[in-house]
Amino acid sequence: MALINNVNFTRFSRFGVNLGRLTYTAATHEEATDGTDELKITCDEDLTKGERLVWLDRQGVVHEHIVDEIERLHDADGKPYTSVTCINSINETWDDYIEDKRPSGSAAVALASILAGTRWEVGNCDQPGGASHTFYHISVREGLSDLLKTWGGELETVIETDG
């Protein structure tokens, strides 16, 4: 777990409207090999479930997290504050549905097939070999897991910004 200092978080509504910078009092980011990627923030502002927080880490990597859990609390003096847990934005694909897709060939071809209709696109996909798989009545996120089991490799998200 990494404590985050001097990082600017930009808030976006679930519809992509820029809500400005988030002023926070504490922030931690946890990313692990088991797929955990959580951002925990304490702030005075009211956040809404589904809002997106975009930020740049010390290595120059852009991250996007979705506000998932919100707690409105009070400190010892009765002053209200907000504690939120945010998850990696790839988790939005739990809400995207695959009716019936049967890609075959490279992992890049299969990935493009299951990401069709989402805001995500295939970036660098260098997994060698070919395979085929049926993705039937599952979420895109489940499809990504199935793809990794069938074609191998690891999933990494890259967020590109325009400013």
Label the predicted regions:
Residues 1-101, 145-155:
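Assembly/oligomerization scaffold segments
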Residues 80-81, 85-163:
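Charged- and aromatic-enriched interaction segments used to assemble
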